[in-house]
């Protein structure tokens, strides 16, 4: 639901901006023309509630995509006028304040490594000074703590949810959806977040938001039993 960026994105698990609804939901024709994704989603919530239908949002706390994140590491801006992001190089506008000047002249593999370095310091430089992402490899073992720190896929870069600023930002962004009227969350890849972090940083905050907005909220996490 949030703004995504990925050459393989079809399911919405590659956030590049947790604070806004993906531009592919924006209005394009008739009376909806010019409406933002946020406005269209609000109308959907209102229409569903008018018919007694609940809206459960699939959310991600564990990772971003590999194109940075608008507030944590703004590697790109998204051309809001291009709905189809299959041609990722067309709809993504590089931010050369952080990306190398020759980024677009590099091949795909080199571009990926340049993006990843800004989030995980994989080139040996301290780009991620605030530790917003975990700086470990892509491999992980379901039975070891690496499942909480390792990157689960090339397209999903593991957020450092042990950094309070990351947790606060995510909670702030998802509070917006509660205010809009979303009735519950299905929390993706919760099994890849350390239980102590999940149970102390996220669950109490979401419960408090449910009380704040005078409504019970459904929290459900995704887990996968070993062996993976």
Which residues does each predicted region cover?
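Glycine-rich nucleotide phosphate-binding loop and flanking beta-alpha elements
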Residues: 63, 185, 193
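Short, surface-exposed connector motifs at secondary-structure boundaries
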Residues: 180-186
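Noncatalytic carbohydrate-binding groove/subsite architecture in carbohydrate-active enzymes
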Residues: 223
